[in-house]
Amino acid sequence: MERRPFGPVPREVPVIGQGTWYIDDAHRPTAVAALRRGLDLGMTHIDTAEMYGDAEIVVGEAIAGRRDEVFLVSKVLPTNASRAGTVAACERSLARLRTDRLDCYLLHWPGSHPLEETFAGFERLREQGKILSWGLSNFDVPDLDAAWKAGGEGRIACNQVLYHLGERAIEHAVLPWCEEHGVAVVAYSPFGHGDFPGPRTPGGRVLEEIAARHGATARQVVLRFLVRRPSLLAIPKASSAEHAADNAAAGALRLTDAELARIDAAFPLAPRPRRLPML
């Protein structure tokens, strides 16, 4: 599995990781098996959040006995992101995950608490060894500028954002900003939200043709397209061990410049929206 830098963090992570949104305790055995299969195949970057319900508990079971292999990320809700609230939320997440540390802790989206307070909480956790690094999620350029000035300069590890073929808004300004400032960009929901292009659509046919040329699947082609720039990482969710294996295979896929151009033309970048989209 190809590995890339994670902002200023002194550790590289796999280009394809594992997301856990909508994983719940009702499907625990299947979810645990999928996550463990992903680990076996090198997808050691696992992303979760306190907002995801039982996901942290499921992740804790999946990584039991393998914690040192994992680059573990969770997120604090903006409503909890005061200085003391950030520390308390992290400690609750650590308990659910059954670990003593996170590799990165994110503010889930901009909220009402001053960023200086949240970042002070992050730094307190880092000093205590409970987190290695910290970052952001769903931050547009004005929010990123504010975060940089509020104490984030040289410290923001990543910005996790919505990014898929039908939603390429980050390419207008967010992605260039992050690249200029040395911040990793992590794509969540890389297959969209129930709107993955079907094989009979014009764009879907392009994906299928390219996939056939490589002995791959359309989803693997999409993942590879989304991480075509060195600053990009992706965290698809897998519903089964087989699905995890399919996602992992995208890490070894290589697309030609001509193929990347075909995909780019089939799913063109839309005009810049007023706000950065998020789920």
Task: Tell where the protein language model's regions lie, with residue ranges.
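N-terminal binding-site loop/beta-alpha segment at the start of enzyme catalytic domains
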Residues: M1-V70, P190, P277-L279
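Active-site groove signature of glycoside hydrolases
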Residues: L97-H113
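A short, structured active-site edge motif that brings together acidic residues
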Residues: E69-A81, C104-H108, N138, V161-Y163
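Active-site mouth loops of central-metabolism enzymes
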Residues: G19-P29, S74-A84, H108, H113
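Acidic (Asp/Glu)-rich catalytic clusters
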Residues: G7-P10, G60-D68, E91-D100, R124-R126, ...
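Short, well-ordered coil/turn segments that N-cap beta-strands
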Residues: R11-I16, G42-H45, R67-V70, T99-D103, ...
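Short, acidic/polar
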Residues: A26-G38, S82-L97, P142-D145, I170
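Beta/alpha (TIM)-barrel catalytic core signal, keyed to glycine-rich beta->alpha loops juxtaposed to Asp/Glu
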Residues: R3, P110-L279
